[in-house]
């Protein structure tokens, strides 16, 4: 009898056939044919091994190329389950505003928050600050990837909400989108949300220039630790309802300390380097 035949006979002797529930439960998760149906539009169910491979591959890829938003998004979803995204969902359920957000399911796009309206708001309002930041950085709220690798539909929305609120965090803190600013914000987000991807992103400091690295560890990482530990859960902020609120007042309410202005620091460094270069040329 062949090896396959002996294995089949052994299974039959124990009452197990390829069609039996015990075997099907083992085989089904690893079969593309038997992959469970999606639980919401765009959902891609993954096996444990597939999720692990996605987590490792996307983490390495995003470290090599921090501008790959798709890899960063995939890493965030693959590493958020099974615990961390549920913790964030539970934080919303335990908060009155968080529960309203989960019930209403608002989305942040250029249609739900028209730029013309945001630009018309008072100068120091949350909405005007958000619009000014978007204009300065040249980004749009419509560029966020849709969640697809989180199985629970409600948790998928929580991740989508975090993702779409990310630019509000940028605007309130004033941090820019280049690598140094993103690292500072990700460190802050990790201590506020505990989403693993935000913590893993910090390792991208190896891509910083020596001066940027020194600045990150001496200025912005300490800021991220202070504000991240002291601040309230940002996932429970209903941004759409506070667009006219004074942004300084909001920072005080959320216990967010404004970090050193990276753009001003860089500008001062360039001016200093220019003056030093001119001085050396005059001495030559």
Curated annotation (Swiss-Prot):
Residues 1-30 form a transit peptide. Signal peptide: none annotated. It comes from the Eukaryota. GO terms for biological process: ubiquinone biosynthetic process. Component of a multi-subunit COQ enzyme complex, composed of at least coq3, coq4, coq5, coq6, coq7 and coq9. Belongs to the COQ4 family. This is Ubiquinone biosynthesis protein coq4, mitochondrial. It comes from Aspergillus clavatus (strain ATCC 1007 / CBS 513.65 / DSM 816 / NCTC 3887 / NRRL 1 / QM 1276 / 107). The lineage of its organism: Eukaryota, Fungi, Dikarya, Ascomycota, Pezizomycotina.
């Amino acid at each position: 009898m062949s090896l396959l035949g002996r294995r089949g006979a052994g299974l039959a002797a124990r009452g197990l056939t390829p069609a039996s529930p015990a075997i099907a439960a083992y085989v089904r998760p690893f079969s593309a044919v038997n992959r469970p149906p999606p639980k919401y539009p765009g959902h891609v169910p993954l096996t444990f091994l597939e999720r692990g491979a996605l987590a490792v591959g996307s983490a390495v890829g995003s470290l090599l190329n921090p501008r790959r938003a798709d890899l960063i998004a995939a890493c965030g979803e693959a590493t958020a389950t099974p615990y961390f995204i549920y913790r964030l969902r539970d934080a919303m359920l335990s908060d009155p505003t968080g529960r309203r957000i989960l019930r209403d399911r608002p989305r942040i796009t250029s249609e739900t928050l028209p730029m013309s309206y945001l630009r018309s708001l008072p100068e120091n309002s949350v909405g005007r600050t958000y619009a000014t930041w978007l204009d300065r950085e040249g980004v749009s709220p419509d560029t966020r990837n849709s969640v697809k690798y989180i199985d629970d539909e409600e948790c998928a929305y929580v991740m989508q909400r975090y993702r779409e609120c990310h630019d509000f965090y940028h605007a309130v803190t004033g941090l820019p989108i280049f690598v140094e600013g993103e690292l500072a914000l990700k460190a802050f987000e990790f201590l506020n949300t505990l989403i693993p991807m935000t913590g893993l992103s910090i390792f991208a400091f190896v891509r910083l220039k020596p001066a940027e690295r020194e600045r990150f560890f001496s200025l912005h990482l300490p800021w991220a630790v202070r504000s991240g530990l002291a601040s309230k859960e940002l996932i429970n902020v209903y941004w759409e309802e506070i667009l006219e609120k004074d942004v300084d007042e909001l920072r005080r309410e959320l216990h967010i300390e404004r970090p050193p202005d990276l753009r001003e620091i860089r500008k001062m460094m360039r001016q200093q380097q220019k003056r030093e270069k001119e001085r050396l040329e005059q001495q030559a």
